[in-house]
Amino acid sequence: MILNVVMVEPEIPQNTGNVARTCALTGARLHLVGPMGFKIDDRKLKRAGLDYWHLLDITYYENLEEFFRKNPDNGNFYYFTTKATHRHTDVKYPDNVYLFFGKETKGLPENLLHDNPQTSVRIPMLNNPDARSLNLSNSVAIGVYEVLRQWDYPKLLCEGKLRDYERDV
């Protein structure tokens, strides 16, 4: 089972750093598709990802054309957008899946969504013209954990343990 997160033209380094941390801690592969609104060595990006960068499987692409050339669609690409009619929870995600997320200000390219209406999905939210979209890194986390939930959280630690400590009584 391989979970891939594809960020198309991300603009805000802190969001990308948060997504990198989510990917590192869930075993998801991160694909960054340019052009990006920041440099890879941006300190805000590194800070948001904390000290998890060594755990991350990350690949960079100059543009979508390069990404699609190196990663052909085998019916396993899902496009997260506010413009979709299908909910992200209505999909049965395959064992090798790619979740696409667009830039913070515009989302995914319209032509990509027009060409893939059956695999475009949305995360439900309020029907309010002032509420355009969820934060990008939050949307990625919601999508990633829905896939992992369906897969029964493979390789993830699902039970925690409190540390022993003495209570003041």
Label each PLM-derived region with a short phrase.
Residues M1-V169:
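Post-transcriptional modification and biogenesis factors for structured RNAs
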